[in-house]
């Protein structure tokens, strides 16, 4: 795998052996038997990867979108923010019949990252409110993480996280957000 990534790596970086990464990789490259499982960069399974790094006003240091699980119709969309300030707030209000939420709103979970969580709980997969029964997907934004098997248009690992003063913490109910 490292041989395939060699052109993208800092070959001057020291390894635990005391050798540089370049020295470790300075061996003849043999086409391994697993090459059909871990594909070379010049022969990918798909043209584009499953993950996309996003940067913008809410994520100046980046965020992750699992493009392969996102709804294409939501990739370029705009919506009203419905904000949950913590995991406890989310648990208490997500299924409240009086929650002011519509299918085209963006659900935002703040303070669920490594410090705000604390400890990076697997909480980024915000459920769709029960009052929106039948809605299959919504844009969801969080500084948390989620399972790799989850699906939907979910933007995760927003950095810097809200708990350390990241801009995600400034979002309020009713703010207009745009994903593009």
What are these regions (language model features)?
Residues 1-180:
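Catalytic or ion-coupling anion/metal-binding cores of large enzyme and transporter domains
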């Amino acid at each position: 795998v490292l041989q395939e990534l060699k052109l993208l790596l800092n070959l001057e970086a020291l390894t635990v052996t005391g050798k540089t990464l370049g020295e470790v990789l300075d061996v003849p490259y043999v086409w391994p038997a697993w090459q059909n499982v871990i594909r070379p960069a010049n022969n990918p399974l798909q043209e584009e990867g499953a993950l996309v790094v996003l940067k913008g006003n809410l994520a100046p240091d980046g965020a992750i979108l699992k493009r392969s699980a996102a709804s294409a119709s939501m990739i370029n969309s705009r919506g009203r923010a419905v904000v949950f300030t913590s995991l406890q707030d989310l648990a208490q209000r997500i299924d409240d019949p009086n929650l002011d939420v519509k299918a085209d709103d963006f659900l935002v979970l703040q303070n669920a990252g490594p410090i705000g969580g604390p400890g990076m709980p697997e909480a980024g997969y915000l459920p769709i409110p029960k009052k929106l029964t039948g809605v299959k997907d919504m844009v969801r934004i969080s500084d948390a993480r989620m399972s790799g098997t989850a699906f939907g248009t979910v933007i995760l690992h927003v950095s810097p996280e809200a708990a350390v003063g990241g801009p995600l913490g400034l979002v309020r109910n009713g703010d207009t957000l745009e994903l593009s």
